[in-house]
Amino acid sequence: MVRLYNTLTKKKELFIPIDKDHVKMYVCGPTVYDTAHIGNARSVVVYDVLFQLLKFCYGKVTYVRNITDIDDKIINAASEKNSNIESITTYYIKAFHDDMESINCKKPTYEPKATENVDYIIKLIEHLLQSGHAYESDKHVYFNIESYHEYGALSGKKTDELVPGSRVEVNENKKHPGDFVLWKPANDIDYKLSSYWNSPWGEGRPGWHIECSAMSYAYLGKDFDIHGGGIDLQFPHHENEIAQSKSAFAGSMFAKYWMHNGFLTVNEEKMSKSLFNIVKVRDLLDSGIKGEVIRYALLKTHYRKPLDWTENVISDAQETLNKFYRLSRGLDTINIDESNAEISKDFIDALKNDLNIPEALAILHEMAAKINKMSNESEKLKLTESFVKSARFIGLLESSYQEWFTAGVSHQEIERLIDLRRAAKQNKDYNTADKIRDQLKQIGVTISDNEDGTTTW
């Protein structure tokens, strides 16, 4: 049985799908105006593992992760770069996909774009207007939070606490400071960049919050099982989604379970442009850090806890994965998913316990220690196959032993070093021969000298 912490009820609950034969989940995806940083990646990695677990336990799972491809930040990026919206979003959508693939994230079932669902958005706004939960003011359409009496159930914030400030837009056209925009009129930049649509309220574009309500409804219906995202989205974004969707569909629960992954800091400081400490996934990859190392580092801390990103986090992940890969030597790891090897039950049980990935990783370490002590080759092989298959379940050990340790090093270069070592030995320069052996070992190449004078690796 899967148990998940539900942010809405503030407790860990037994997960009971609305339809036991079809689990539905929605996760807020990227706003594509820049490349992904590690905070973005953490959310993707967490819900990627959840997706795999739910498929394992329940079979059919529909996972929707949206793309926000119209937003003030995107418009500003296009304007600053003297480009157009489509060029900006196309470029960053591809960059996002490339980066997430590099850290072994599988694709969701659907990945709708906001711009492709404007018709749904307009219909939802019309419905909210007709039911008295929204109003027009100065060519804008706003949601009336006082019309929804359960506002604040997710975040704990009440309507009388919402005063104009950093997270509440100051606007005298609103009935209440906490009212949020569903539709905004086009301005000069919108017309210049063609970032507007026709609507019953004039030319304009949707607000951010209504986009997710419309897309989740379009792909999952009015009720679904899990809504996920980063803790930074809990308020106001997710709170506003609930208000919109439950107001639009009387009797709807919208999302039954709400999940939020924790904040990510860098050296105990919040990531921000002003501190120049934003860590991009692409920069890490370009520096030579493997995607799987990034993934392990993001998984090591429980998803609900804050994660502090340091150099030690990366070095520990690299060291651990090197150890894990050494155990896989000689196995056909790429095709092991089709083998008869079983995923560790303890490993799966850890994941079923509110996606306790750190506990699952600890079980992998226990399996590794046991493998190293085993002398029975048959039993050792069986446990090693289970170890690798378990690790692959959460997106680790996706490469072969040789690919992992020789990435970026050609076979020709390895053979050249072996030839140099052989020549050094023939000249009785054993110091150089040992240095070359150590050099090969550092890149994961273990060599054996044969009686006939040849060397294998």
From Swiss-Prot:
Annotated catalysed reactions: tRNA(Cys) + L-cysteine + ATP = L-cysteinyl-tRNA(Cys) + AMP + diphosphate
A GO term, aspect molecular function: zinc ion binding
Cofactor(s) it depends on: Zn(2+)
SUPFAM superfamilies in alphabetical order: Anticodon-binding domain of a subclass of class I aminoacyl-tRNA synthetases, Nucleotidylyl transferase
Principal subcellular localization: cytoplasm
Keywords linked to the UniProt accession: Aminoacyl-tRNA synthetase, ATP-binding, Cytoplasm, Ligase, Metal-binding, Nucleotide-binding, Protein biosynthesis, Zinc
Gene Ontology BP annotations: cysteinyl-tRNA aminoacylation
SMART domains in the record: DALR_2
Annotated residues for binding of Zn(2+): C28, C212, H237, E241
InterPro entries reported for this sequence: Cys-tRNA-ligase, Cys-tRNA-synt_Ia_DALR, Cys-tRNA/MSH_ligase, CysS_C, Rossmann-like_a/b/a_fold, tRNA-synt_1_cat_dom, tRNAsynth_Ia_anticodon-bd
Cofactor note text: Binds 1 zinc ion per subunit.
Localization annotation: Cytoplasm
Chain residues that bind ATP: K273
Annotated motif 'HIGH' region, positions: 30-40
Gene Ontology CC: one annotated term: cytosol
Gene3D superfamilies given in the database record: Cysteine-tRNA ligase, C-terminal anti-codon recognition domain, HUPs
EC number: 6.1.1.16
Binding partners and assembly: Monomer.
Family label: Belongs to the class-I aminoacyl-tRNA synthetase family.
Name of the protein: Cysteine--tRNA ligase
Organism of provenance: Wolbachia sp. subsp. Drosophila simulans (strain wRi)
